[in-house]
Amino acid sequence: MAELDRKELADLVRRLSVVQGCVTLSSGKQADHYVDLRRATLHHRASALIGRLMRELTKDWNYTVVGGLTLGADPVAIAIIHSPGRPIDAFVVRKYAKTHGLQRLIEGSEVSGQRVLVVEDTSTTGASALTAVRAVQDAGGDVVGVATVVDRGTGAAEAIKAEGLLYRSVLGLADLGLG
């Protein structure tokens, strides 16, 4: 990984996304800080860094499509597909299938028969990533691994690896001065 880019991203995430105070995470766990990574993934400079760093992090994984559970994964996937390198397409996993139109759970690029990278913005327990993994597998996709921008160090890596999947992250809480 380009260390200067990684340090710059950590600085941006710390400045834009770290919120101090007691919060309830999506897992139901309590924390004394929150990493609202959408503030970084939707920032012009941070998004470009995320795209480059995620491509670098997963360069040895052979995948053609990237995405994950909406909403956190969406800007991460878009950053990756717009980062320089080989062509990669994106998809979005809805939390629930639509009840009208095509009633799809997965929108965007087709995942059936494809090698797929599942992404997240921030990982806590890995539940969101694993929800996306199951949806992709049910749709006929081959998940090559899971990558996240920030790993909170609270069980996501272990849960994802327990499912037999590769797992990597760009940053940990220590990189943000929180660990």
Curated annotation (Swiss-Prot):
Name of the protein this chain belongs to: Orotate phosphoribosyltransferase
Enzyme Commission code(s) on record: 2.4.2.10
Pathway it works in: Pyrimidine metabolism; UMP biosynthesis via de novo pathway; UMP from orotate: step 1/2
CDD domains for this protein: PRTases_typeI (cd06223)
Family as reported in the entry's similarity comment: Belongs to the purine/pyrimidine phosphoribosyltransferase family. PyrE subfamily.
Reaction(s) catalysed (UniProt annotation): orotidine 5'-phosphate + diphosphate = orotate + 5-phospho-alpha-D-ribose 1-diphosphate
Keywords: Glycosyltransferase, Magnesium, Pyrimidine biosynthesis, Transferase
Species this protein is from: Mycobacterium leprae (strain TN)
Residues that bind 5-phospho-alpha-D-ribose 1-diphosphate: R94, K95, K98, H100, E120, D121, T122, S123, T124, T125, G126, A127, S128
Job description of the protein: Catalyzes the transfer of a ribosyl phosphate group from 5-phosphoribose 1-diphosphate to orotate, leading to the formation of orotidine monophosphate (OMP).
Record carries keyword Cytoplasm: no
Cofactors demanded by this protein: Mg(2+)
Enzyme class: transferase
